[in-house]
Structures are given as C-alpha cells and as structure tokens.
C-alpha cells in the first residue's frame, strides 16, 4: 500500500496492468464492431453482384440493342421485353427494400420513369428517322441512368 503519500512500485505495476487490460478490452470491442461492419459490407457487395450483374452485363444491353421503329414509324414491340427485364430486375432486387430502402425506392422510381417513357414513345408515330433516333437515345439515356445509379450505390458500399 501507500506509505506517506508515495505509491509503491507494485501498486504502479497493478495500475498500469489495469490500464492495459481496459485498453485491450476497448480495442477488442472496436475490432469486433469493425469486423461486423466489414462482413455486412462484403455481404451487401455480394448481393449487388448476385442480383445486378446478369442484368447490367447481359440482359439489359441485349434488350436495348433490339429497340427500333417499324416501317410505319411505331416503336417496335421489342420495347416490351426491355420493360419486362427491367421489372424483373426490380423484383429480384426486393431484398434491398429491407436493407437499403432509399436505394430500392430510387431504383424503382427510375425504372417506372423508363416504363412511362416507353409507353409515351410507343403511343406516337415517328416517320422521320432523325426523330426516331432521338427517341432511341432518350430510351438509352434512361437505361444508362438506372445502370449508373446501381453502379454508384454498389461502389459506395
């Protein structure tokens, strides 16, 4: 013990040992938290890839490539298959409505905008080839915004 206000060496050692134990405990807690966060991030990244890769790399580009106008100046019915692929992607991404509702709503809203655009364009007739190309570019742009949105969120994980 303390004699005459001085702390003995054994007490100093005990105090240092206690501080080291507390510090070591705090570091353990922090590393568990960081590891859990990393596991969640890795899991989310895995889900993004699992859900979106097939659409972004294959299905969507193939459907967009088929978009064209028929000889009467109407949007070819191939736009319907693009629309169903987009809706299928949103359905398969429903997992994110639970873990990242803001992202899911953004994806859903952008896909609905594309749907509305496709319906709008398909309801009109475009005789002029330049006008037809402008509309195809609008469709490609809307699809591009959806893919960019997905990629942006994937890279933020």
Annotate each predicted stretch with a short phrase:
Residues 8, 71-74, 125-128:
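Alpha-helix capping and helix-coil boundary motifs
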Residues 33-82:
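Amphipathic, membrane-active segments
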